[in-house]
């Protein structure tokens, strides 16, 4: 079997022109690099959030997010009996999205900690200072003000069919179901640190 796979690979390399193979490898390399940048951007936001939350009253930890099928962050205030299950998104576009399955897992973890008097699912959005736009088929970046929003998603706790949540640069939120977007109002959560500040 292994010999057959090696033979097929060698045949492909012989039949496909070198410049096409180079182009395919180049595109794969670009996509890999873009995905890595997006992951690093997300990890950076999560890391900064944890740093800002950790203090005399609050304790926070990153859990691993999508790869671990867990929320990005959990934070607790044991003095005031508050628990937060946080899904964090950051990017350079004008809109950021939280998939329904990621919201669901936040509720699953939140519901495990019913000993806390107050428990919220928080959708955290960070719009980077660089705004990505397309001009004449090219991607360019323009400077803009850093924006952060922390939305309470508790209203979806009892729903079986959760929507995708979209947040725009001005803080407006939308529910997306079956490719249809409908504006919704999610209350802002007052975080225990200065919002839109760079740590």
Q: Which positions does each model-derived feature cover?
A:
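Conserved catalytic cores of phosphodiester-cleaving nucleases, focusing on short active-site segments
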Residues: 53, 73-75, 82-92
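Short, charged, amphipathic alpha-helix that recurs within catalytic cores of restriction-modification
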Residues: 96-123
